[in-house]
Amino acid sequence: PEASYTLEEYFRKNFDPGIMALFTGELGFSEEEIEGEFRFWQDWVRTRIPVAYPGIREILQRHKEAGGRIAVVSHSMRENIERDYRENDLPEPDVIFGWEQPPEQRKPNTWPLEQIMERFGLEPQELLVVDDLKPGYDMARAAGVPFAAAGWANDIPEIEQFMRKNCDHYCKQVSDLARLLEAGDLPSACRRLMVCACEDVGLAYPQIIPIVKAAVDIA
């Protein structure tokens, strides 16, 4: 009862060290107190549906239509995630790993990403984790998966500074994520260029292949 935080202070602590580390470390919650916090949280979200950021639905729809997968790794409960996606008319996720998982299978543990890769036959570089908090970043880094920071979630300078410095991609606006998914990262773009040079343009103009190869190496 003697501890109090402003909303911005809470955001900082939720970012790092994360919610459970805050509860068990700085606040020293007992198991009973953590269970009470969980019940309070569930009562709160039961009657409150968050509204998706403008543009998110269109991004997810295009991603699915292009053959992409949507996986949710969250500290929310699966039933709440399914409801929120449904109420916001978002594409149904292909897989969800929520708070109902045992602690050792929640982020920042890499278990959810390992399951996603195994289920869909993907390599780490074929995934992209999009998150606004450090536990998601830590999970992606430990699994060798590219990470894009959802910078539109807050305007806290320390968080933005960390994300810009350490993440593969920093998306300040939702539209930045749209551009990232449509354009791809640099290695992917270079691979596409080499395929075009060798299989398409190269058939008619073989001399283009070493030119493109040199440009790709520089990039």
What spans do the regions from the language model cover?
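N-terminal helical cap/lid subdomain that shapes the substrate entry/recognition surface
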Residues: 1-57, 65-66, 213
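Residue-level marker of alpha-helix boundaries and capping positions
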Residues: 10-11, 50, 72, 126-128
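Substrate-recognition element of Asp-dependent hydrolases with the DxDx(T/V) motif
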Residues: 37-38, 59-88, 97-99
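A generic structural signal for short coil/turn motifs at secondary-structure boundaries
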Residues: 46-47, 70, 104-107
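Residue-level marker of regulatory loop/turn positions in helix-turn-helix DNA-binding domains and
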Residues: 52, 73, 105
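Asp-based, Mg2+/Mn2+-dependent phosphohydrolase catalytic module
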Residues: 78, 82-219
